[in-house]
């Protein structure tokens, strides 16, 4: 009998909506990067992935307010001392239960960079065949600046964050922290009793309603594109 394992508390950390959001975002971001680099007819799918990412971002912002305990922004750890403690391999147990200090900063960075990338994409124009759905609502100067950011700065920032995220997962796996597994089944074995995220049918129904509203809102934004 593994006495250490018998003293661990299996706790629901990531509710199903958060897990589905995470993996849907992974697929959508990879799709964005790949189709954006291919160009040409693949840009049709680039726009579709962009629409999906916009809906997912809106969902995450709302779910960060009403979602499971560890998915809420109020439980993110962004204190500088917590960041320093994690870098030194220290910190309280609760700092590694949900998103750690560095993990919290990574989520915030991802959301901000993706918002900037999607936002700039909405008003970008490749000057060949494809233009964002909102380019007709802003000046040509804004379109030019947004296009430059979207194709150069934003894309590199996004790819850089993705690579850092992958390296962080590898590092945590080496340290014995199964981050990927927890984001699949939702649970973590904890040495101390910690609050569990609610993940019942009520929370999942609420998430479904929020997601439908976000999908509708994203579709509406993209429907503003002029028709010729």
Residue map of PLM features:
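Membrane-embedded alpha-helical bundles that constitute the cytochrome b-like, heme-associated redox core
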Residues: 1-228
């Amino acid at each position: 009998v593994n006495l250490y394992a018998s003293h661990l508390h299996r706790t629901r950390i990531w509710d199903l909506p958060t897990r589905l959001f995470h993996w849907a975002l992974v697929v959508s971001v990879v799709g964005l990067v790949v189709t954006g680099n291919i160009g040409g007819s693949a840009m049709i799918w680039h726009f579709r992935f962009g629409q999906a990412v916009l809906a997912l971002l809106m969902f995450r912002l709302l779910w960060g307010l009403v979602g499971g305990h560890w998915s809420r922004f109020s439980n993110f750890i962004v204190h500088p001392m917590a960041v320093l403690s994690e870098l030194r391999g220290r910190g309280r147990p609760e700092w590694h239960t949900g998103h750690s200090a560095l993990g919290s900063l990574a989520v915030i960075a991802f959301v901000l960079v993706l918002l900037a990338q999607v936002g700039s994409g909405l008003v970008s124009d490749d000057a060949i065949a494809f233009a964002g759905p909102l380019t007709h609502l802003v000046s040509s100067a804004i379109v030019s600046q947004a296009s430059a950011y979207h194709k150069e700065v934003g894309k590199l920032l996004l790819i850089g964050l993705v690579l850092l995220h992958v390296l962080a997962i590898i590092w945590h796996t080496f340290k014995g922290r199964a981050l990927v597994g927890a984001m699949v089944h939702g649970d973590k074995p904890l040495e101390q009793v910690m609050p569990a995220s609610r993940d019942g049918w009520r929370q999942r129904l609420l998430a479904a309603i929020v997601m439908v509203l976000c999908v509708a809102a994203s579709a509406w934004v993209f429907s503003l594109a002029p028709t010729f």
